[in-house]
Swiss-Prot record:
InterPro entries: Ribosomal_uL3, Ribosomal_uL3_bac/org-type, Ribosomal_uL3_CS, Transl_B-barrel_sf. The lineage of its organism: Bacteria, Bacillati, Mycoplasmatota, Mollicutes, Acholeplasmatales. It comes from the Bacteria. GO terms for molecular function: rRNA binding; structural constituent of ribosome. Belongs to the universal ribosomal protein uL3 family. This is Large ribosomal subunit protein uL3. The keyword Electron transport does not apply. HAMAP family: Ribosomal_uL3_B. One of the primary rRNA binding proteins, it binds directly near the 3'-end of the 23S rRNA, where it nucleates assembly of the 50S subunit. It comes from Phytoplasma mali (strain AT). Keywords: Ribonucleoprotein, Ribosomal protein, RNA-binding, rRNA-binding. Signal peptide: none annotated. GO terms for biological process: translation.
């Protein structure tokens, strides 16, 4: 069944399983999740649930935003995202009332999830670092070392051409990650492997889309 929650990446650690194998773990704080809005196919044309995460001071919000939070009877939130659901597929969030707090028991250890976040920004980078292209000769007399080389005779710009430019700071989705364990007391998810973004970066955790589609086909 489809579901999702917002969180903040705390950092990485490691644990050992019963066989003594080392497992890299990312810790995600999922406390303070509140439902802000419900969108339906009849009214909005698509099915989704809007969530808010991480409270902030009222003076940091605009008046329209404060009215939006007031409708949900909650404090202003720093990170707001919509989790969209495929029509005809059951989900656990659409029937919940506005202002409902989501807890860690929404997911269970062993669940397979997709994690969406903003990758670390690397600034302006050359094509060798950005696209893993080969370097030129390093010997004396060579005309280029790390330049991108000829762009070809085609006139104008070509979309998707591998050139120097902004690297990182893009929305990245990692699929089929496993929730290794859950700390219900501190409201933490321990996810196997790494996830996008720096420490303290916001992420969205959803039931793996491939799992949802497979369950729907089997049903």
């Amino acid at each position: 069944m489809a579901k999702g929650i917002l969180g903040r990446k705390i950092g990485m650690t490691q644990v050992f399983d019963e066989k003594g194998s080392l497992i890299p773990i990312t810790i995600v704080d999922v406390s303070d999740n509140v439902i802000l809005q419900q969108n339906s196919v009849e009214k909005n044309g698509y099915l989704s649930t809007q969530l808010g995460f991480s409270s902030k001071r009222e003076k940091l919000s605009t008046k329209p935003a404060l009215g939006h939070f007031k409708n949900a009877k909650t404090s202003p939130k720093r990170f707001i995202k919509e989790i969209r659901f495929l029509p005809g597929i059951k989900n656990e969030l659409s029937e919940l009332d506005l202002g409902t707090s989501l807890k860690t028991n929404l997911f269970q250890p062993g669940d397979i999830v997709d994690v969406i976040g903003i990758s670390k920004g690397k600034g302006f980078s050359g094509s060798i670092k950005r696209h893993n292209q080969s370097e030129g000769p390093k010997s004396h007399g060579s005309r280029y070392h790390r330049r991108p080389g000829s762009m070809g005779p085609i006139k104008g710009k070509i979309k998707g051409k591998k050139l120097p430019g902004q690297m990182g700071h893009q929305t990245v989705t990692l699929q089929n990650l496993k929730i290794n364990s859950i700390d219900h007391e501190q409201e933490l998810f321990l996810i196997k492997g790494s996830i996008p973004g720096p420490r303290k970066g916001f992420v969205m955790i959803k039931t793996a889309i491939k799992t949802v589609i497979k369950e729907n086909q089997d049903a």
